């Protein structure tokens, strides 16, 4: 026959049950908050991708405009001299740099949009699902059994 539980404080068991219930609630809230943050990360990456794609389209227009301005300055003046095109060349370089930056950002967003699901799956989904199953099933069932045993101990003690 196995030895008894050697319970010395029924109140201590009640306090432990209450603390475990608080833990279950807090862990559930944390899990829900983490899931929400993951959804926000997916949404943010998608939104950033759209913003950078739009910036790329604007950049293409700016490059076209800068090229047109530069081409217009390459014709000789009325006196036969070639006008200075440094400002237009600088504007073209800046527009091309902005366009290149936007294109790089689009590629980064696409890369992260492809990588993030795998990262989440590897580091969170399995563990999160196990924790959620524990919090929704095993913990309440175990605490219910413990509460019934505490009630039995109280009846025995009276």
List where the protein language model places each region:
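Conserved NTP-handling cores and scaffolds of large molecular machines
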Residues: 24, 31, 106, 127, ...
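Short, charge-rich amphipathic alpha-helices with coiled-coil/heptad character
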Residues: 1-48
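Long, hydrophobic, amphipathic alpha-helical segments used as structural scaffolds
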Residues: 31, 35, 42, 103-113, ...
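Extended, helix-rich structural scaffolds rather than catalytic motifs
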Residues: 129, 133-158
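Long amphipathic alpha-helices with heptad-repeat character
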Residues: 17-20, 24-31, 52, 56-63, ...
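A short, terminal or domain-edge coil/loop segment
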Residues: 33-40, 89-100, 126-139
């Amino acid at each position: 026959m196995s030895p008894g539980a050697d319970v010395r404080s029924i109140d201590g068991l009640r306090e432990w049950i209450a603390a475990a219930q608080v833990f279950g609630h807090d862990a559930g809230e944390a899990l829900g908050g983490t899931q929400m943050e993951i959804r926000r990360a997916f949404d943010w990456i998608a939104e950033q991708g759209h913003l950078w794609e739009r910036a790329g389209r604007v950049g293409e227009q700016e490059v076209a405009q800068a090229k047109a301005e530069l081409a217009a300055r390459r014709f000789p003046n009325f006196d036969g001299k070639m006008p200075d095109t440094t400002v237009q060349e600088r504007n073209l370089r800046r527009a091309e740099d902005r366009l290149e930056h936007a294109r790089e950002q689009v590629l980064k967003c696409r890369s992260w949009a492809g990588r993030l699901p795998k990262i989440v799956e590897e580091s969170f989904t399995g563990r999160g699902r196990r924790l959620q199953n524990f919090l929704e099933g095993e913990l309440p069932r175990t605490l219910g059994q413990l509460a019934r045993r505490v009630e039995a101990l109280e009846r025995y003690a009276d």
